[in-house]
Amino acid sequence: MALYKIGITEAGDAGVDLSWVEKLDRVDAAVLITKCVSPDFFDAALEHKDRLIVHATITGYGHSALEPNVPTPYEEFAAIMELVKAGFPMEKIVIRIDPIIPTEKGLSVAYRTMISFMEMGFQRYRVSVIDMYPHARSRFKKAGLPLPYGDS
């Protein structure tokens, strides 16, 4: 029998869909994954900060052809910093640089993003390289961008 029950927001975005709040009474803690530290998420995360770990995904491509519905990197960086300033523990935030696009520009964007957070004192990171799922391939083609792994 498990000692603790941990929830995780694997589907959707915890910053946009706050249905996780009402489910917190069924778990001991939760891992929230978001690309958008929205005002409602900000308030809920602060209220429940003792039971949460936040995975803040920031790729450096927010509000671009690749991630049109995601806040700009500057907006998301500022929102994450405000969350910490308001009292959410920095050590409970994992900066997710996900996905990294394996091109010279993509690696440079990922590097600059990580350095920005390192300079502010963040120590927990998670990275992954892009998988070219059909929806990702479609988004690249629609934006007129070359596929990082070629056409095959």
Descriptions of predicted regions:
Residues 7, 12-15, 60-62, 87, ...:
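Residue-identity detector for glycine
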Residues 55-57, 63, 112-123, 147-151:
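Short, Lys/Arg-enriched charge-dense amphipathic segments
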Residues 62-70, 96-105, 146-151:
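Surface-exposed cleft-lining segments at the edges of enzyme active sites
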Residues 75-139:
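Conserved C-terminal portion of the radical SAM core fold
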Residues 135-152:
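A conserved mid-domain beta-alpha-beta active-site/ligand-binding segment of alpha/beta enzyme cores
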Residues 1-79, 92-94, 124-130:
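Core AdoMet radical
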